[in-house]
Amino acid sequence: MNIASRLRLCALPLAVSLALAACGGSSAPSAATDTAAPAATTEGQPAAVELPAGWQRVAGTDVPALAGQSPALPTTVQSDDGAQAEVSDISRIIAGGDDVIAVLEALGLGKQVYAAPTNTTTQAGQAAPHQFLFNRTTGVEGVVSLHGSLFLGNSLRRHTVLAGKLREVGESAVVIDDLQPAPDKVRKVAAAVGLADAGQTLATEVQRQLDEAAAVGKGLAHAPRVIHVSATGAGGLPTVAGADSASAQLIALAGGVNIGTEAGVNRSPY
């Protein structure tokens, strides 16, 4: 069964669960058979992308969203790299990863995404005025030259040093660790843009869908073995997702066995 590559937030683990349920012979909800059903469009959040011919959407039309929120700024938050960060302007957000952008879209702030990674697959990222390479070698000068108002990094490994240097030159920078549970990421991204209460509401819904996905996974007759191969990890070379990757967490939650974990791969390709 083919799965749309752009199922985001908690809709992705639910999709994985349903897909593995199909592979494992368990019955899945009838809604999972809908093909290319578009998601409802809300302000700041794009509708689902039409799927290529022959693809099937097993889940993802119910991505939680809270549009029309009013950010409370300025705000001070604890960045995951240990620093206190003050945020006063979110009009031009430089986003370090699609997970951050997905939360911004869900909060109705997709139009505030000013710069995104070159390999972004989110609509807000692709529509951003700038696409930029974010990795361990990204220089502070290049980020400053974008003239953004807030840098939202998504990796302690890639963005801790960069965020520190940005703060040294007076730029606002927050890092959200990409390896933590999705509800925690939602809360922290929302807090960083002055929407802490909305983030709590959204995170609660994300957790509900995660629990739903886990329940589907528990019903599998056997645990399918799944491998996630990334074309953008390890310096752009094909990489298998290891035990510390988000993919491994989703596969396990959905009742499958991550082959990368089984093979002793520990690092994430991202």
Model-identified regions with their sequence ranges:
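Bacterial Sec-exported substrate-binding components of ABC uptake systems
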Residues: 2-14, 21-99, 198-227
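A short, structured surface patch at a secondary-structure boundary
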Residues: 55-58, 64-74, 91-146, 150-155
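Soluble non-cytosolic domains of exported or imported proteins
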Residues: 71, 94-95, 137-138, 153, ...
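Extracytoplasmic/secreted envelope proteins and their assembly/folding machinery
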Residues: 74, 87-91, 97-104, 110-111, ...
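Extracytoplasmic substrate-binding proteins
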Residues: 83, 160-236, 260-262
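Short, structured coil segments at secondary-structure junctions
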Residues: 109, 128, 168-170, 254
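Short hydrophobic/aromatic-enriched beta-strand-loop microsegments
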Residues: 111-117, 153, 170-176, 258-260
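Alpha-helical, coiled-coil/dimerization segments enriched in small aliphatic residues
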Residues: 119-122, 238-269
